Every structure is written in structure tokens, then in C-alpha cells.
Swiss-Prot record:
Subunit description: Homotrimer. Interacts with matrix protein.
GO cellular component, one term: viral envelope
Organism expressing this protein natively: Snakehead rhabdovirus (SHRV)
Intravirion side: 487-512
Topology in membrane: Single-pass type I membrane protein
Record field: transmembrane: 464-486
Record PTM: Glycosylated by host. Glycosylation is crucial for glycoprotein export at the cell surface.
Signal peptide: 1-25
Record function comment: Attaches the virus to host cellular receptor, inducing endocytosis of the virion. In the endosome, the acidic pH induces conformational changes in the glycoprotein trimer, which trigger fusion between virus and cell membrane.
Name by which UniProt lists this protein: Glycoprotein
Name of the coding gene: G
Major site of localization recorded for this protein: virion
Taxonomy, superkingdom: Viruses
Subcellular location: Virion membrane
Residues forming coiled coils: none
Amino acid sequence: MTLPNMKPKRIVLFLVFLNAWVSNAQVTHKPRPDSIVEYSEEWENPIYTTPSHCFEDTFAPVKPEKLRCPHIFDDQNLGLTASKAKILHMDLKPEDTHFEAKGRLLHKVTYQVLCSTGFFGGRTVTRKVLETPMGDNEAQAYKAVDREFPYFPEPLCFWLRDNVAAERVFHFSTPKTVTVDLYSRKYISPDFVGGQCAKSPCPTHWPNVYWVGETQSPECPSIDTEGGHIFTKKDTHRITKAVVHGHHPWGLTKACQIQFCNEQWIRTDLGDLIRIEPNDGTSSLTLPKCQDNVVQMRGNLDDFSYLNHAIVNMAQRSECLEAHSSIVAQQKVSPYLLSKFRPPHPGLGKAHYLQNNTIMRGDCIYEGVAEISENRTTYRNLKGEWKKWSLSRGGEGYDGMTVGTKIVIPDLEKYQSIYDNGMFIPKLLGEVPHPSIVITYNQTDSIETGIFTDGKLLNMGVNWTLWPSLSGISLFTVASLILIWYCCCRVTPQALNYSIPMHTITSRGVEI
């Protein structure tokens, strides 16, 4: 259906959808080839990775001790192009969220004395305090006096004259601090008419009372201009971040444009305000208008935000090493432990799944996950494509993703306590490559050491019985054994050695 043939209601819906799509579209910037530079800075990891394509012919059984935790890359700029740019950023501090302006409330009053004199010289004196109108210019030009004590003037009295006035004008000045709206650069106070004022002096709800600020217009925080780089994707040319040496990176994947201090700024992913002027001759970058007027003003609290991905990497590697130690020691694995070996970076990586109680390992292409559907059956990658999760040939998901018929997203759900119980049920591995030393601690902290082979404890000479062997031999053999035992009883028996033969461990190549 073409646009001219659409009904009016459908046209309105189409325009609303088009406007929403345009407002959320990400800004692209294709730098000139001569402006591209080599630059290296670390960047955030994706929230989750999953295999999108696996090479099934590469999967083979792997022994538990041969498992390896994924490599953590230092450079996260694969697939990005860097170009020089001039970056202006506003020096916002946490206290700027309560930016205040000093001033005073100015009140003009008149102290009046009225005198009336009668025929016989009697006097009537009346004293009044009157509200006196005051103009903007008068309020702005008034200079505050440290100490000004009001008083009534001496009465002026004349015979047979009534209401002779003697007046004196005073200005009452009271210190008053108001809030500054850094978006519109206006003074904000409930005392003002309309709740705000663009320029001092500001009229108040009280008659003839003005608020006078130390400066006519609110001041804005300082602006720093530095040379930096902007990063764009090589394939889509979408802007991902801006970097200035000595400052944390500014993410621009969800950036938008906002008016702040009567100027247009780019609000970054985490709420900072910057402006970007590329050095390749193009104009300043403009982005879609923000849907709200919120600036987080993180300030110095976020100077270490660029270390977030490093902290996440260390935590993931520690969890992986603990999972590896547990699998090797117990010769058991659960989907939860297997999920710790998932690579945190997109690209070629090792994937694992369970098949017939054996860990299978092979090569897969991992991609970043940007969003997960409500029923968790599909996901959206960084390119905006909705796809289904890749499952192994046995129906189990890679990296411990599928438990029965339920899709479990490791790492994204572990802090929400919605893991299925099946994620934590350990499965005994069918193939045990070598004996393992298992140390158990009881309540008295004593240590019992045993050798496990195929899950059975080898007790040398302990709880051993002859009956299974005697049941299958002849009577003559039994009599011969009794005779030999009678002869051996005359010799003093030596103490049995119940120690564990260490050659058993050595001959099998135990790795401790």
C-alpha cells in the first residue's frame, strides 16, 4: 500500500513511527581516509556473548584438566576506526546538581509621621509604616548598607493644619540564596512570581519586594577544550565513543542532543556533556534530541569508570578458575560451572557442551548480545538482528545454556536468583583420566586423604574378603590353602602396611 492511498489514521501512525525511529537512530560519521589515525584505548565489554556459528567438525572430547579459561584481550578496538577531533566537555562536579546563586531580598518601606494641630494648640501625632513601590532599576542600582536602622522622623506640626507628613524611606535587605536551573539558566525559587526569573532583580509574591542577585545572569560551569579522538565502526560508520587523553572514555552508542546553559550539547551514555568538532573539515556532530532533560553530572566520581571492564574481566577469570578447580577435583560438572568458560569477547572462541557425560570442546564464532526477548527464546545482536540461540547437536545449549527445556542466560541472571535448579546439579563425568587427590575437611579440621579412581576408593588391605574368590575354586584347592595357612601361622606375622602406595600415583602421572 502506497502512502497516498493510506487512510488518515494510518498516515498518522506511520508518521509517529517514523519520527520515533529517526529520533532513536544512531549517528554515523565517515571520516576522511587522511584523518584516520592509529589509536589504542580499552573499551567496555558487551553485556553477554553467545556463539552464532559453530564448526561442528572441530568438537572433540576434552579431559577436565585440559580445560582452559578464555583469554582476556587488552585491546577492545577491533573493528573500530579512530579519527582526530576537538572535544569540548563541561567540567561538572557532583555539587553542581545543587547549583546556587547568592543574593538578597530587598524591601522598600516608608516611615511616616502625621501631625494635626487644633485651635488651642492641641496635637495629634500618628505614626505609620507604609509599603512603597520600587522599580526594577531602583532595585538593581541599590547598594546594600551593612547597618541601616529604621526610625520615625520628628513630626512637623503647624497651627490649624491637619495631617502634616514627615517621611523617611528605608530599604530592608535580607540575604537569600536561590537555585539556578543550568538547563535554561534561570533563577528558581518558590518566592518568585511564576517560580522562576530570567534576570535579576526578580519580583516576588510579596508586594514591593525584589530578589537581587550578585550577578544579573546565572553563570555556567567552565568548559574545557582538548584534542582527542572519535571512534566509528568500520562497517556501519556508527559512532561508538570519544576519548581524550587522561580522561575516561565517553560512550556515544545511546547519545542524544540536549540544551544546557542555553547551548546545545551531546549527552553521552552515562550523562556527561560534550561537543565534538571533527578535524577533517566536517561540521560539529549533531544527534537526535533527548527525550528528557536529565544530566547526571557524574564529575570526579567517574574518573575511574574506564576501569569497569577490567574489574569485570578479573571477576570473570576468578570465577572461571574456581570452576576449573572444582571440576578437576570432583570429576563432576554442572551447566553452571560449564558456563564460566564462555569467552567474554566477540569473535572466534572455544565453546563447550555436555554429551554422554563428556565435555565437548570446539571452535565457534561469538557475537555480542544487545537485547533478549521476553520469553528468552531469541536475542538481538549488535547489528539489530533477532536470532535464535545456537544449540549443540545433542540439543543442549553451548556453555551450559539449556537445562532441560528451559533457556538459561548465565551471568545475566545469577544476580536475579532465577536460575533453574538444574543449573547446579553436578553430573559425574564418564571418563576419569587419572586419580585425583580429594581433601575433605570435617568439623575438627582434620584431613582425610584418599585416592579416587572411577569414583571408587582404593583401600589397600582394608575391608578385603576372600569369599568372592573362594566361591569359584575346587575343594582340593581349598585344602591346599588351609595347609599353607597352618604352616604360616608358626611364623610371627609381620604388621600389615596400610599406607597408600605412592607408586600408583607416579605410574599414572597424577598432576596435583
